[in-house]
Amino acid sequence: MAITAQMVKELREKTGAGMMDCKKALQETNGDIEQAIDFLREKGMAKAAKKADRVAAEGLTHIEVEGNKAAIIEVNCETDFVTKNDQFKQLLSELGKHIVANEPATVEEALQQKLHGDGETVESVITNAVAKIGEKISLRRFEVLEKTDNDAFGAYLHMGGTIGVLSLLEGTTDEQVGKDIAMHVAAVNPRYVTRDEVAEEEVNREREVLKTQALNEGKPENIVEKMVEGRLGKFFEDIVLLEQSFVKDPDQKVKKYVADKGAAVKTFVRYEVGEGMEKREENFAEEVMSQIKK
């Protein structure tokens, strides 16, 4: 398989490894990006965790709580200037209220519903906002959580909504505990609540990478397994909420903080504006020329 410059660029962005190392890794793995990442890690040429996807699109997250239901949404626009616009913020609020009340299953379904059950469709309301504000605006995603009277939501918006986290805790009605967990999730970005949620396939893959790393370091086989288990603990700390040191008190784990409050984390949803979206790249010289020609 031909290795393209774009493939090398993507691998470099994800691993931080050198260009020639990335090219060799792709050649060795027949162009498979995921295998190439493992190859680089086994050789000690890449960081243990992939770099986060480049965040490019603008917009805000918003959280709407109504009784025992709460919705977290992400709405995108083209520039961060628009996120400070009162009309854009009002649109966020209206969309949040609609979604928490109507619980559409998909974005497509939400767009076809009448806003608040009457009048214009959600899609038309967004289209009208585009005409007034002058930028493309889109409802990207949302999730609705439900609780009982004995549970608590935790809502946290970082930097006005560039990151939004909605948590759901059982066994407590203390919203501050929920917010503390939401703040931690915003800061540390775990992927799972408990170890049990991590797929066995993912754990086994990590174990193999760590084992190869240890052997490549020249460690004796009789201590490799112990080393691997030790490093697996760090792997779980990186991705599992309850295994992490609590950001507001690093001397204790999140697990202990929650247990001391008589609570349990049921779930959380974390949205970071634009994650996984690629911004259009333009050559700076070409951009200048295009402005001159106007």
From Swiss-Prot:
Pfam families: EF_TS. InterPro entries: EF-Ts_dimer_sf (IPR036402), Transl_elong_EFTs/EF1B (IPR001816), Transl_elong_EFTs/EF1B_dimer (IPR014039), Transl_elong_Ts_CS (IPR018101), UBA-like_sf (IPR009060). It is found in: Cytoplasm. Residues 79-82 are annotated as: Involved in Mg(2+) ion dislocation from EF-Tu. SUPFAM superfamilies: Elongation factor Ts (EF-Ts), dimerisation domain, UBA-like. GO terms for cellular component: cytoplasm. Its main location: cytoplasm. GO terms for molecular function: translation elongation factor activity. Keywords: Cytoplasm, Elongation factor, Protein biosynthesis. PANTHER family: ELONGATION FACTOR TS, ELONGATION FACTOR TS, MITOCHONDRIAL. Associates with the EF-Tu.GDP complex and induces the exchange of GDP to GTP. It remains bound to the aminoacyl-tRNA.EF-Tu.GTP complex up to the GTP hydrolysis stage on the ribosome. Belongs to the EF-Ts family. This is Elongation factor Ts. The gene is tsf.
